């Protein structure tokens, strides 16, 4: 991202803007507003036809219909003012160290910092390399289906990101914390070179949230250590996650195994019921797969025992394995409605593979106590 030594040019004048336009822009850039450590980053920059916010780790800019002078405005107070007043027009007068905001008969005077203090950012078009163009709804679904498995607390920083691997006309989204892995494949309609980019979980979840409200496409690009996503006039930029990502394709076992099929909602409900008696010391649920159904059992000295049965739609092969119910629920909640779940388990010590629609997951078993 840009350093604080880079400055913007500014000229004194005023601003007239529709409140709904400004409210929408503030909501768009909210996730990138900085904290107390750098007071200038608690402001939003308005100028050059955009509203911008950055915390130096992520930057969001949103196009607005405004070509007036540059100004920094405090995000929190501006949001509160727009939320408390209603009018067809917001008038902002710019002074040397303050601004006035007028909405209808109400007026506020706020201290401001020079717009030149806001960190500038730019990437030459020649430096940008296309990664993929993905329909916004598919992008949001892909991120939702994998991001829960990333580990943002690990000392292995790479595990705190979501890998986007592009090859052979598809983009594969992957996340793992070392104990589970999630994968989702999306077809792309753009001819690009094969690539693998590791996106920070926070940034890619922000992009997905914005994409969920768009009917267009998400254009992903890389530029050195920067990753850039563009969605209908909104640009999100972030640093690439450093570190070596696991060889995730090796996690999916190559074996001959028959999967058992169950209704996703029934499997989710059964797992939640069985997990009621689990604890931090006894967190596992034992899944016993038979031709009669899936029996779920849990036990802890402080909370008691549970026994639940989940019916099946098709039987694969018998197996018993102990899994973390949180991991199972996370996978099932991320899958699309209406799709059954396939459970591929072979024994108590081997990884369990889950499939539902376009979602793929691997969960490592827990040791029997």
Language model: regions and residue ranges:
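Structural preference for solvent-exposed beta-strand-turn elements
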Residues: 1-369
């Amino acid at each position: 991202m840009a350093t604080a030594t880079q400055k913007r040019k500014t000229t004194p004048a005023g601003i007239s803007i529709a409140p709904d336009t400004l409210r929408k822009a503030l909501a768009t850039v909210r996730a990138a507003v900085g904290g107390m450590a750098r007071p200038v980053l608690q402001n939003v920059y308005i100028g050059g036809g955009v509203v911008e916010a950055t915390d130096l780790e992520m930057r969001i800019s949103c196009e607005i219909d405004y070509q007036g002078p540059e100004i920094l405005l405090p995000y929190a107070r501006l949001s509160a003012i727009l939320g408390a007043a209603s009018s067809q027009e917001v008038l902002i007068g710019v002074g040397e160290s303050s601004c006035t905001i007028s909405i209808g008969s109400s007026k506020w005077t706020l201290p401001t910092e020079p717009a030149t203090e806001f960190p500038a950012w730019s990437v030459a078009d020649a430096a940008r390399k296309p990664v993929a163009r993905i329909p916004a709804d598919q992008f949001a679904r892909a991120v939702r289906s994998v991001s829960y498995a990333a580990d943002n607390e690990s000392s292995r920083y790479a595990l705190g990101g979501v890998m986007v691997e592009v090859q052979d006309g598809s983009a594969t989204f992957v996340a793992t914390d070392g104990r589970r892995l999630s994968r989702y494949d999306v077809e792309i309609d753009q001819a690009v070179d094969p690539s693998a980019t590791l996106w920070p979980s926070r940034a890619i979840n922000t992009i997905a949230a914005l994409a969920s409200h768009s009917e267009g496409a998400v254009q992903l690009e890389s530029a050195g250590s920067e990753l850039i996503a563009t969605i209908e006039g909104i640009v999100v930029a972030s640093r690439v996650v450093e570190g070596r990502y696991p060889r995730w394709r090796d996690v999916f076992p190559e074996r001959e195994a028959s999967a058992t099929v169950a209704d996703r909602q029934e499997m989710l409900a059964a797992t939640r019921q069985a997990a009621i008696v689990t604890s931090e010391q006894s967190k596992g649920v034992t899944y016993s797969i038979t031709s009669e159904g899936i029996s779920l059992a849990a036990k802890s000295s402080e909370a008691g025992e549970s026994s639940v049965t989940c019916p099946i739609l098709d039987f694969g092969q018998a197996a018993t394995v102990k899994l973390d119910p949180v991991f199972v629920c996370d996978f099932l909640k991320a899958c699309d409605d209406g799709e059954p779940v396939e459970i591929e388990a072979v024994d108590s010590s081997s990884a369990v593979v889950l499939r539902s629609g376009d979602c793929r997951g691997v969960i490592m078993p827990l040791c029997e106590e």
